[in-house]
Amino acid sequence: MTLILKKNDDKGEIAMAKVVWQALESNPDAINPLMSKIGVESVECVDVISFDDDALSHLPKPQYAMLLCLPDYKKVDELMAPIYEKLRAESVTPPANVFFMEQKISNACGTFALFHALANIEDQVDLGSGSFHKWLEAAKGLGIDQRSDLLANDATLAAAHDEAARRGDSRQPEEVEHHFICYVNKDGTLFEIDSRAPFPRALGPTSGDTLVKDAGAACKHFMEKLDNVSFAAMALVPKK
């Protein structure tokens, strides 16, 4: 974890501190040890090779969530801005039953996507009694704009993230352009949860048998409009 200190130009004093983490790789070999480290042993991530029916038929079930790593977060923001503006104009409010937090930690979107997925399936799986469970219980009592700070100040979870980030096969880029979001089944509804967005977005019905297929259909617009094929997806499924 790194703190970037920014000076106040007028007084020459420290005005703010920004928390920066190492970026996670979209790789089960990084994500699964992270879950074990934070006390979650009931689920694991597996690669989603393709969204075609043949590839999906080999995925374990039930499928609880999907983590999607997108290229070029700036273009993603441009694509999503009018969608959220329309939802706001329609007075759509964040669903009370969906756990969500605003991301204030740079490069931490992989862990935010994972934590959003885990937090919203606690009624379906055993999340254990480790550091994630303890953090989640505390985070539930805070506002969505306070939960990121709670995570940033949790030395155990920060260390677990850092260890997982260093497991990746790729070198850390100078500027991280990829961005993780998650799709999760909450009470039979598929939600898209993006820690850079203002609130979770309901997409329609889903189930443990069809979640990855449904999520694949939902994210198709990204794949069609981004001039980049560097996508990666992982499904969250029962641990073998």
Task: Spell out what each predicted region is.
Residues T2-K240:
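Cysteine-dependent deubiquitinase/ubiquitin-like isopeptidase catalytic cores across multiple families
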